[in-house]
Amino acid sequence: MGKGDPKKPRGKMSSYAFFVQTCREEHKKKHPDASVNFSEFSKKCSERWKTMSAKEKGKFEDMAKADKARYEREMKTYIPPKGETKKKFKDPNAPKRPPSAFFLFCSEYRPKIKGEHPGLSIGDVAKKLGEMWNNTAADDKQPYEKKAAKLKEKYEKDIAAYRAKGKPDAAKKGVVKAEKSKKKKEEEDDEEDEEDEEEEEEEEDEDEEEDDDDE
């Protein structure tokens, strides 16, 4: 990914993110010359957040609401630079892209890693999962690969039916075209799958973080 547009509004922050920012500022004031062990610091913040009352969290939730309003207001007036591709519209009724074997593996092991290391960031959790997958034997990967292959097969049937709705000839043409360029299509699909999975993982992690905020 290239560098983003510097004029693009800063992303909105969650109540927990504001809390961590405040903790960091407090730590800097108390220990201006001390270096921070980020992993240890994150863990302490996470533990402290979980013991806070709803009233104590209220201040940070108000900050998050105000920041969300600021972000939405700025995005209304933000004009993307020329040449920047807009994200293609996704029909909510379209069949959902199937997860890859790695994504299925991540879904199974992510909660375990988060439970063992509650202070880890989204990026560190993803890195750990990647290392685990790379160190997994081919035989142990097979159940995930078989499940992913079945889901992909089902998706291809579902998407063909979805695209053929209202276009009777499209299904026939689609089958012939798919046979001719199946390899190319699979490569393109795999690339898109990876992008979608990254987005889905981020969304899942953000949702989980927001759930922690609400507790």
Swiss-Prot record:
It is found in: Nucleus; Cytoplasm; Secreted; Chromosome. The keyword Chaperone does not apply. There is a cross-link at residues 28, 43-44, 68, 180, 182-184 (Isoglutamyl lysine isopeptide (Lys-Gln) (interchain with Q-?)). Changing residue 23 to S: No effect on nuclear localization. Decreases interaction with BCN1 and impairs in autophagy induction. Abolishes cytokine-stimulating activity and no effect on chemoattractant activity. Residues 76-95, 161-215 are annotated as: Disordered. Its main location: nucleus. InterPro entries: HMG_box_dom (IPR009071), HMG_box_dom_sf (IPR036910), HMG_boxA_CS (IPR017967), HMGB (IPR050342). Residues 80-96 are annotated as: LPS binding (Lipid A). It is a peripheral membrane protein. Belongs to the HMGB family. This is High mobility group protein B1. The gene is Hmgb1.
